[in-house]
Amino acid sequence: MDLNSASSVVLQVLTQATSQDTAVLKPAEEQLKQWETQPGFYSVLLNIFTNHTLDINVRWLAVLYFKHGIDRYWRRVAPHALSEEEKSTLRAGLITNFNEPINQIATQIAVLIAKVARLDCPRQWPELIPTLVESVKVQDDLRQHRALLTFYHVTKTLASKRLAADRKLFYDLASGIYNFACSLWNHHTDTFLQHVSSGNEAAVLSSLERTLLSLKVLRKLTVNGFVEPHKNMEVMGFLHGIFERLKQFLECSRSIGTDNVCRDRLEKTIILFTKVLLDFLDQHPISFTPLIQRSLEFSVSYVFTEVGEGVTFERFIVQCMNLIKMIVKNYAYKPSKNFEDSSPETLEAHKIKMAFFTYPTLTEICRRLVSHYFLLTEEELTMWEEDPEGFTVEETGGDSWKYSLRPCTEVLFIDIFHEYNQTLTPVLLEMMQTLEGPTNVEDMNALLIKDAVYNAVGLAAFELFDSVDFDQWFKTQLLPELQVSHNRYKPLRRRVIWLIGQWISVKFKSDLRPMLYEAICNLLQDQDLVVRIETATTLKLTVDDFEFRTDQFLPYLETMFTLLFQLLQQVTECDTKMHVLHVLSCVIERVNVQIRPYVGCLVQYLPLLWKQSEEHNMLRCAILTTLIHLVQGLGADSKNLYPFLLPVIQLSTDVSQPPHVYLLEDGLELWLVTLENSPCVTPELLRIFQNMSPLLELSSENLRTCFKIINGYIFLSSTEFLQTYAAGLCQSFYELLPEITTEGQVQVLKVVENALKVNPVLGPQMFQRILPCVFRGVIEGERYPVVMSIYLAVMGRVLLQNTSFFSSLLNEMGHEFNQEMDQLLGNVIEMWVDRMDNITQPERKKLSALALLSLLPSDNSVIQDKFCGIINISVEALHDVMTEDPETRTYKDCMLMSQHEEPKVTEDEEPPTEQDKRKKMLALKDPVHTVSLQQFIYEKLKAQQEILGEQGFQSLMETVDTEIVTQLQEFLQGF
């Protein structure tokens, strides 16, 4: 691409590509896409975006195309890679002038220089760093800033490289420029502090921006640039200097008010100082040891004493608390139980910590956390009134403690209390004792203090296990507080019910549950929505608890379910509806079939909620979870839900529909439990199986559930299902088998085994295409025992229950292996006998014995040759399935099932599903459970004897080991 002639053409097309008119925009984008691989295109783009007279939008687009080009074509091995000559020209052009006037474009240029540096620096671009170092020294403000901006992005990018060779290069770079970076930062910081006192706002902002950028560079060099940073005097000097600088900047915040244009940048710089300390502590805990004392003194004084008044702000307090927390919790500072096993560095750090956290310091921190930071703020109380649902779902999970004040204070309290519980337990107990009895509803401050102390007692529940008689406290103090219905008392009603939820799994007597359920029923009718939502949460914790007893809960079930349902209707926010649905699901799951009389209202409401939640996939996930538990609770009655249930399953498991990304896992689970609880198949239930084929193609972690669903259909309606879907299913399995893991192969073949078990006539025909590979696996001696076991189970089913099909399969395989049928059968029996040890389940061992015995009686010489092996297998199976009656000394087959056997269901066990009943009916027709192995062997041997005569039979029996014969005779006593 000739630069001079091409520039105007490219400029014109870029201008068209900034158009709002798609008729102009689309062809321009297409043309630019074609030019991406043209030599010289990126040189033209460089000329365009460095020409400050051109339109800003056009230059912006040129930078973006250049940046994408680096990602796609800069590497030498990339298809259509840029030539080394062009890259060399581009590198030189990028760092010729640092004079971009537009901030956004300057940032993009800095980022793309960093991208090139990641690939080429220092080997192909040794001049980059020296050029940047010189450029940040110039007097021109704009050039200096742009060079510093680029310096930061390059440092950040090089610091992020993780390969050992790249790390080594970055260490070399850091040690080479660290002194310069420190002096640069000090210079800009001093300049800023001078400007602050002069009152020149523009100069203050400009110097502060440079201070921030130079500090960002230092952060990356300090944290990522040294293997043992504590051995470098400059690094440790910089880190120690941070505390003094922080004090200076915090003092500046007194003079720079909240409405000042510099305020935001100032706070960012203060936070960046703390990030340097936090990152350094995270990456180099041992190197941080000399900084522990100073960090703790600094953080504690600003957060827990009057030193911080008037200068601290929320994000800074959070960072200081995180610094304290990371020092308290750091494993590198915790000695082993046996002190001698700990490193000197660990012992030194531990000593510094112990010297700092004295009794007075810990007591003051604990008291300040509870009486100051735990108090509900004016802002929170206003939110409670104006947006109760927003108040209840305030972010408290995951990493919120790193950024938000309330979760941060609570996590710090938990960690300090855990670490120093012997010191702090008496302090908290004393706080509790001062708050005994009811609190005056007119004294809002006293109510908030009590709320804060109760919060601490809840958070420290595990630590206070031995120190608080919670059952007594519940009866004498907490229960009466829940009964105070005054509106101003609602913070305490909410806090007390929350507190009980925290203690439920720690220490709460089972006998007190009914009293708690009574209280929950009352609070679910509280006038305040926040109290009702908190009560629902505690109900979930109570029902979820290990010691939950259904019999205690049942008297309150109807009331609670009705009130929870009302709450579900009352709340409007998606998150709150999800939360209440989870509580309902939990209740349904625990009481199971007992829920049936009370679910009518919920069943009617869920379709409406599903419709309303079209845009809220996470809420739909919660609805799916609720439906799963509902179907399990309703059992066969869940058929009445099909008009709503089946379209929901259809949508959730349709991979062509966008929502499946969120809904698939729960949708498959719902599909499975629907099948398990279905009393009979319906055309609609059969129809949604059309979704299965694409799901099998996905080969995702959901395959196991998919196989369970297929089995569910086979048990539910084998003939109809197999006639409709077996051909497609067989094709999917055929394609899937070579691609999947051993475990996956077993799952596929279990489906085939079930089809053969349920429908011995139709099954083999339907899966005809898969059976040769099973046969092949047996003949060739499949090496994985679990796979061989399932191969033999499938073969056993065909041989035992569909002999004619087995003969045709044997014939087909004879042609493939170029062997006579008898010879091939002999090889199969030999391998079967040899690999019988691969079968671990007694049912399958018995199946193998029955299958091979079914070849008898026979005058076929091959089968007679293998007679010894068949008897060996049969006796092995007898050992596994026969139990001896100690009184009569006779044996009976423990696999046999009778029509009248009803399994006893204990109170803790779930009642059998419809699928369990179908499996029981199937077992009653299965030879494994209906044919006595003892009798079968006896009859087969008798028939063989009749064919061969006494002498011939005796000769045959002599081929069997005498010990085996003795065992066989013992088992056959009485026949």
UniProtKB/Swiss-Prot annotation:
Where would I find the Importin N-terminal domain in this sequence? 28-100
Phosphoserine-modified residues are S343
- Function, please? Functions in nuclear protein import as nuclear transport receptor. Serves as receptor for nuclear localization signals (NLS) in cargo substrates. Is thought to mediate docking of the importin/substrate complex to the nuclear pore complex (NPC) through binding to nucleoporin and the complex is subsequently translocated through the pore by an energy requiring, Ran-dependent mechanism. At the nucleoplasmic side of the NPC, Ran binds to the importin, the importin/substrate complex dissociates and importin is re-exported from the nucleus to the cytoplasm where GTP hydrolysis releases Ran.
Q: Name one GO biological process term.
A: ribosomal protein import into nucleus
Q: Where are the HEAT repeats?
A: 123-160, 283-317, 318-356, 422-459, 473-509, 511-548, 555-593, 600-636, 640-677, 683-720, 731-773, 819-849, 850-887, 957-974
What is annotated about its quaternary structure and interactions? Interacts with UBE2E3 and RPL12.
- Show the PROSITE patterns listed in the entry: IMPORTIN_B_NT (PS50166)
- Gene encoding this chain? Ipo11
Query: What is this protein called in UniProt?
Result: Importin-11
The family annotation for this protein states: Belongs to the importin beta family.
| Short name of one Pfam family | IBN_N
Q: Which GO terms describe its cellular component?
A: cytosol; nucleoplasm
- Disulfide pairs here are none
Q: Does the keyword RNA-binding apply?
A: no
Please give the residue positions where the record annotates the modification N-acetylmethionine.
M1
Q: Which PANTHER family match?
A: IMPORTIN-11 (PTHR10997:SF7), IMPORTIN-7, 8, 11 (PTHR10997)
User: Highest taxon of the source?
Assistant: Eukaryota
